[in-house]
Amino acid sequence: MGRGRYPARLKVTVPPPEIAARYYRSWPAHELYHHPDRFPLLNAESLFGRNAPLTLELGCATGEYICTLATAQPDACFVGVDIVAKPLYRAVERAVELGLENIIFLQADARLLYQRIPDCVLTTIILHFPPPLLRNRQRNQLLVSAQMLGCAERSLVPGGYLSFLTDHPDLFSLMQELLPAFPRLRGLPASPSELAVFESHYHRRWAARGREIRGLRIERIAEE
């Protein structure tokens, strides 16, 4: 999720039970860590009851970006993940306003979710503007990690890809340093059209402050 106090300032209410049952899931970290088998697999069949292309956004915040994708691709399925509940409540409101039937929001620690994602089930992973967390004591909380890339290499279908955007040069460099350890992933510079396809809140925010937006399209290479 993007940096700053934006989520803390949100004025939102907890979704009513019937709306939450449709759009919202909470997977507590303690239980997910100690009893992962109590949670469903993160695939379209388990979460939506059908086989369909599945996109996962890590750190989706208020769901602006992933709801736009879900609106444009009604036959696909989408899961937005964030560790904080309040922005997800706004994401649920957005999905209801748009009448979406192909999206679920999941409050969970993304690092604990990877074990619940089967092989070759994701067409796209979205990781846009993750927090840098560059203090030494926070390094293990980074979403840009070997653990995340290992999950991407395993869970993306051949030809699928991870979309990565950041305004932070150190995070971009870290991603480039980690990639060579994953031979089935290939990092390509994001094209101008990919960078401009839709600008989320954080994209607009950091671009307006004059920060350079860097991006990679990290493709899952088909095995020969």
Swiss-Prot record:
Signal peptide residues on this chain, from the entry's feature table: none
Gene3D superfamilies: Vaccinia Virus protein VP39
EC number(s) given by UniProt: 2.1.1.33
Residues binding substrate, per UniProt: 167
Keyword Secreted tagged: no
One GO MF term attached to the UniProt entry: tRNA (guanine(46)-N7)-methyltransferase activity
Pathway the protein contributes to: tRNA modification; N(7)-methylguanine-tRNA biosynthesis
Keywords: Methyltransferase, S-adenosyl-L-methionine, Transferase, tRNA processing
Alphabetized SUPFAM superfamilies for the sequence: S-adenosyl-L-methionine-dependent methyltransferases (SSF53335)
Function: Catalyzes the formation of N(7)-methylguanine at position 46 (m7G46) in tRNA.
Name of protein: tRNA (guanine-N(7)-)-methyltransferase
Species this protein is from: Chloroflexus aggregans (strain MD-66 / DSM 9485)
Lineage, opening ranks: Bacteria, Bacillati, Chloroflexota, Chloroflexia, Chloroflexales
Chain's gene name: trmB
